[in-house]
Design a protein with these regions (language model features):
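Vicinal oxygen chelate
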Residues: 14-15, 67-117
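N-terminal beta-strand motif that seeds the catalytic metal site of vicinal oxygen chelate
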Residues: 1-15, 66
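Conserved beta-strand in the GNAT
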Residues: 47-49, 119
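A generic structural signal for short beta-strands and their flanking turns/coil linkers
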Residues: 5, 35, 44, 62-64, ...
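Acetyl-CoA-dependent GNAT
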Residues: 51-53, 97
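Core segments of cupin and vicinal oxygen chelate
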Residues: 9-47
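Short glycine-enriched loop/turn motifs at secondary-structure junctions
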Residues: 1-3, 59-63, 101-102
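Short, charge-rich, low-complexity interaction segments located
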Residues: 48, 55-59
Length: 119
C-alpha cells in the first residue's frame, strides 16, 4: 500500500474501526495486528492504534480532525451520499462553507466509533 501521507490515531475497538473504515467508508484493509489496523484511503495510509486510555470527545472540529481533499464535486457528493446511506454519525451535516469567498468549499464532518473526526 504505497502512501503519500501517514496518520496514526487512537481507537477503542479495532473491530468497530475496521467496520467503519473498510465496510462503510470503503478504505482498503492493510496490515493488522492485535494492537493496530492499517487502512488505505485515497492513496494515504491511516493507522488505527488500540488505546486503553479513555478517548476524550472533542468539543468542536478544532484542533484535531483529519480530512480528505477531493478535487471534484462528484467525488465529494458520492462520499456524502455513502455516509448518509450508511447512517453514519455526522458531527456536522454536509454544507457549503465560506460562500462567496476564495476559500469557499463543501464540507461535512463524520465521527468514527471512537470519536475521531473526519472531514
Amino acid at each position: 500500500m504505497p502512501a503519500i501521507f501517514h496518520l496514526a490515531f487512537p481507537v477503542h475497538d479495532l473491530t468497530a474501526a475496521k467496520q467503519f473504515y473498510v465496510e462503510v467508508l470503503g478504505c482498503v484493509l492493510g496490515r493488522e495486528s492485535s494492537t493496530a489496523v492499517t487502512f488505505g484511503l485515497a492513496g494515504h495510509q491511516l493507522v488505527a492504534h488500540l488505546s486503553e486510555d479513555e478517548l476524550d470527545r472533542q468539543k468542536g472540529i478544532y484542533p484535531r480532525h483529519f480530512g480528505l481533499v477531493l478535487t471534484r464535486e462528484e467525488q465529494w457528493q458520492a462520499l456524502a451520499d455513502r455516509a448518509q446511506a450508511h447512517h453514519l454519525r455526522f458531527y456536522q451535516q454536509p454544507r457549503r462553507r465560506f460562500s462567496g469567498t476564495r476559500i469557499e468549499h463543501r464540507t461535512f464532518f463524520l465521527e468514527d466509533p471512537s470519536g475521531n473526526l473526519l472531514e
